[in-house]
């Protein structure tokens, strides 16, 4: 039997064919990301970040303010629709922003009206304002749930950013 016998040639062809088939399977079977696809993914992430950007839409969720400020018992239909349409990753951030704007405006208005008031009257107002702020934060945290938003999060972790948010205050 020589080196190029028919059985050796067939065996070599089988191994070569198997190798080519495996190479093609791995080459086309494993997903790869080329520069164009990677750039498209990056643009999608940037677009999502921009969609959460508070500067893009400063009046976002303004229809929910009356509910948070206790001028309404339930959020308006428009408020709930806006929340429902909003992307889940932006929802709590938008609620926090709207609450912060509302509280900072109220704090500014309070500071103007309290300048000439007696000290103990200003303290009572601050205590009352602190309770109102607590209620607004609670309403804000559960706003997605109150509106029956289907996608999570249905509760937001709301942070305090107001000058009235002192812990262990001496105003009692």
Curated annotation (Swiss-Prot):
Gene3D superfamilies: Plant lipid-transfer and hydrophobic proteins (1.10.110.10). InterPro entries: Bifun_inhib/LTP/seed_sf (IPR036312), Bifunc_inhib/LTP/seed_store (IPR016140), Napin/2SS/CON (IPR000617). Residues 151-160 have a biased composition (Basic and acidic residues). Residues 1-35 form the signal peptide. Belongs to the 2S seed storage albumins family. PANTHER family: 2S SEED STORAGE PROTEIN 1-RELATED (PTHR35496), 2S SULFUR-RICH SEED STORAGE PROTEIN 2-LIKE (PTHR35496:SF4). This is 2S seed storage-like protein.
């Amino acid at each position: 039997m020589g080196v190029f016998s028919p059985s050796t040639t067939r065996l070599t062809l089988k191994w070569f064919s198997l190798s080519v088939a495996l190479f093609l399977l791995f080459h086309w079977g494993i997903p790869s990301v080329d520069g164009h696809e990677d750039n498209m993914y990056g643009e999608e992430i940037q677009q999502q970040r921009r969609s959460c950007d508070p500067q893009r839409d400063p009046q976002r969720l303004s229809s929910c303010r009356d509910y948070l400020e206790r001028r309404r018992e339930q959020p308006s239909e428009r408020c709930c629709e806006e929340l429902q349409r909003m992307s889940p990753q932006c929802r709590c951030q938008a609620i926090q922003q709207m609450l912060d704007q509302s509280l900072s405006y109220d704090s500014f208005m309070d500071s103007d009206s309290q300048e000439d008031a007696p000290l103990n009257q200003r303290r009572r107002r601050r205590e009352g304002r602190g309770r109102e702020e607590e209620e607004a934060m609670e309403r804000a945290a559960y706003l997605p749930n109150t509106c029956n938003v289907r996608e999570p999060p249905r509760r937001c972790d709301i942070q305090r950013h107001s000058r009235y948010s002192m812990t262990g205050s001496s105003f009692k």
